[in-house]
Amino acid sequence: MPMATTIEVADYTNIMPITVSITVYLGVSIGIDTSTTGFTCFSRY
């Protein structure tokens, strides 16, 4: 059990930064896409 919990904690600490970085990266990419499309639509008018 101690070994399993240690591995679980290690996996959790390793996975969390990766998921956070992926979420931030996707959020920034989506934000850039929406801002650029909104800018082009706004410039058309």
Curated annotation (Swiss-Prot):
Q: InterPro entries recorded for this chain?
A: Corona_NS4 (IPR005603)
Superkingdom per UniProt:
Viruses
Question: What Pfam families does the entry give?
Answer: Corona_NS4
The Swiss-Prot or TrEMBL record describes its family as follows: Belongs to the coronaviruses ns4/ns4.8 protein family.
Protein name in UniProt: Non-structural protein of 4.8 kDa
Annotated organism of origin:
Bovine coronavirus (strain Ontario) (BCoV)
